[in-house]
């Protein structure tokens, strides 16, 4: 079985104006995460080279904040061009919040292949986890990305206290969008966050993967944040459940599995790694 590996780079971290209860980058909570307006282009390129060395096909440029303004758009485009020049075979993904069709077209011109903007949860449950922007604005940004000609990467976070009905509604919304890839994150409570919910069991997490793939058979289901903590020794069962991709290395503000360990284990299990996108 061939799977896709993706890596992410947090190129602008923290001080986000939004009050998302699950996020340590929100200015509404006190955390000890690193905060910076921009990462040096040379460091981004170095991380991209390391991602490629670790068999990654996708490389995501992530910025904290509500969305793109002119300055941030220019910076992300600069980063994309720098990575493309030095590591031409990576598929570049941008994750920069709310964006207009015109802004997204600029990202595409700069070499961005796919835009990631998660709905996070259902329309009904969203007001319980964020009050500073609407679920509808997130949905619209996804429509904008499609109109701009970008591939769509859209998923969310499970384990925030949502009901099974919420999960079903969430998947129905994803079906409307039909994203190219669908990231699944499992919420891990942090003492600094307002949101404190019990950790999902491995069985429940694997059921979420199965249900997502059943709802979105044409999408690449990507298991991301919380994989190592929630699933532990069962984490590679995600591929039997329908996943076709994982995020390797560190996440935005938390440590992930050492990429070399993932690669060794996956090769031992007979997996190969996608080197191009079909």
Swiss-Prot record:
Radical SAM core domain ranges (all copies) = 1-227
Co-factor binding details: Binds 1 [4Fe-4S] cluster. The cluster is coordinated with 3 cysteines and an exchangeable S-adenosyl-L-methionine.
Pfam families per the UniProt record, alphabetical: BATS, Radical_SAM
Q: Which domain of life is it from?
A: Bacteria
Q: Which UniProt keywords apply?
A: 2Fe-2S, 4Fe-4S, Biotin biosynthesis, Iron, Iron-sulfur, Metal-binding, S-adenosyl-L-methionine, Transferase
Binding site residues for [2Fe-2S] cluster: 60, 95, 153
| Disulphides | none
EC?
2.8.1.6
Cofactor(s) required for function per UniProt: [4Fe-4S] cluster; [2Fe-2S] cluster
* Chain positions recorded as [4Fe-4S] cluster binding sites: 16, 20, 23
Which CDD domains does the UniProt record give? Radical_SAM
Q: To which pathway does this protein belong? A: Cofactor biosynthesis; biotin biosynthesis; biotin from 7,8-diaminononanoate: step 2/2
Checking SMART domains in the record gives: BATS (SM00876), Elp3 (SM00729)
> Does the record carry S-adenosyl-L-methionine as a key word?
yes
- Function recorded in the entry: Catalyzes the conversion of dethiobiotin (DTB) to biotin by the insertion of a sulfur atom into dethiobiotin via a radical-based mechanism.
> What is said about its interaction partners and assembly?
Homodimer.
Q: Which family does it belong to?
A: Belongs to the radical SAM superfamily. Biotin synthase family.
Protein name (database record): Biotin synthase
Species whose genome carries this gene:
Campylobacter jejuni subsp. doylei (strain ATCC BAA-1458 / RM4099 / 269.97)
């Amino acid at each position: 079985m061939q799977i896709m590996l993706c890596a992410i780079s947090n190129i602008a971290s923290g001080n986000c104006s939004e009050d998302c209860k699950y996020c340590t980058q929100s200015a509404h909570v006190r955390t000890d995460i690193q905060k910076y307006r921009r990462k040096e282009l040379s460091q981004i390129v170095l991380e991209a080279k390391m991602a490629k060395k670790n068999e990654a096909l996708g490389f995501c440029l992530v910025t904290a904040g509500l969305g793109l303004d002119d300055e941030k758009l220019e910076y992300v485009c600069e980063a994309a061009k720098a990575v493309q020049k030095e590591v031409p075979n990576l598929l570049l993904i941008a994750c920069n919040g709310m964006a207009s069709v015109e802004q997204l077209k600029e990202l595409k011109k700069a070499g961005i292949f796919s835009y990631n903007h998660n709905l996070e949860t259902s329309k009904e449950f969203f007001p319980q986890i964020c009050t500073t922007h609407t679920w509808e604005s997130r949905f619209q940004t996804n429509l904008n990305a499609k109109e701009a000609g970008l591939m769509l990467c859209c998923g969310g976070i499970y384990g925030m206290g949502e009901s099974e009905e919420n999960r079903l509604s969430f998947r129905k919304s994803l079906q409307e969008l039909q994203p190219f890839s669908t990231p699944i994150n499992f919420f891990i409570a942090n003492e600094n966050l307002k949101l404190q919910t019990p950790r999902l069991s491995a069985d429940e997490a694997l059921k979420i993967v199965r249900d997502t793939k059943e709802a979105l058979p044409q999408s690449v289901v990507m298991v991301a944040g919380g994989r190592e903590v929630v699933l532990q020794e069962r984490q590679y069962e995600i591929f039997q459940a329908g996943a076709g991709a994982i995020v390797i290395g560190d996440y935005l503000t938390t440590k992930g599995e050492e990429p070399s360990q993932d690669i060794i284990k996956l090769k031992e299990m007979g997996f190969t790694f996608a080197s191009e996108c079909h």
